């Protein structure tokens, strides 16, 4: 095992919206180190959000992330030859990480033509408490509720 835990690196706020959350979304969407493409996808999606909702895109984005954040998740714990899915509380940092991961994964799975439209629509849906990423959070919470009996195995 490792001697020391790797320290968390702090991301810089993005130049347009001055938000660390947007920078993290850009990093999450980026493939093969192509940051410019990832930035254009995010900012174009934000422009589409502004056109469709007539609201500030950063507010819609923050509301979407807030709606996707899970409060409980399941971890598999092996006890006496049986595997139990133990519900545990999610730290604030991991809530954001999971929310961004789910948002972008479910945006990629949508049926629209280009990623900017997919992402914009997924963000709008999530801010209205619908869409694949919100359903993922609901499913996670449902599973945690179903396995509440194993909560005493928490560590």
UniProtKB/Swiss-Prot annotation:
GO BP annotations, alphabetical order: translation
GO cellular component: small ribosomal subunit
Pfam families (UniProt xref): Ribosomal_S7
Keywords: Ribonucleoprotein, Ribosomal protein, RNA-binding, rRNA-binding, tRNA-binding
Record carries keyword Protein transport: no
Record's subunit section: Part of the 30S ribosomal subunit. Contacts proteins S9 and S11.
PANTHER family: RIBOSOMAL PROTEIN S7
Family per similarity comment: Belongs to the universal ribosomal protein uS7 family.
Identification of the protein by name: Small ribosomal subunit protein uS7
């Amino acid at each position: 095992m490792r001697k020391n835990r790797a320290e968390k690196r702090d991301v810089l706020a993005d130049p347009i919206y001055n938000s660390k959350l947007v920078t993290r979304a850009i990093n999450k969407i980026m493939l093969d180190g192509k940051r410019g493409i990832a930035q254009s996808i995010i900012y174009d999606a934000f422009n589409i959000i502004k056109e469709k909702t007539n609201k500030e895109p950063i507010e819609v984005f923050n509301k979407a992330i807030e709606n996707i954040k899970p409060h409980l998740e399941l971890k598999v714990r092996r006890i006496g030859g049986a595997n139990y899915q133990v519900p545990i509380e999610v730290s604030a940092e991991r809530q954001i990480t999971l929310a961004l991961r789910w948002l972008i994964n479910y945006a990629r799975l949508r049926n629209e033509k280009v990623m900017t439209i997919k992402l914009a629509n997924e963000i709008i849906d999530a801010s209205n408490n619908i869409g694949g990423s919100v359903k993922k959070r609901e499913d996670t919470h449902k599973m945690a509720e179903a396995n509440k009996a194993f909560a005493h195995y928490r560590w």
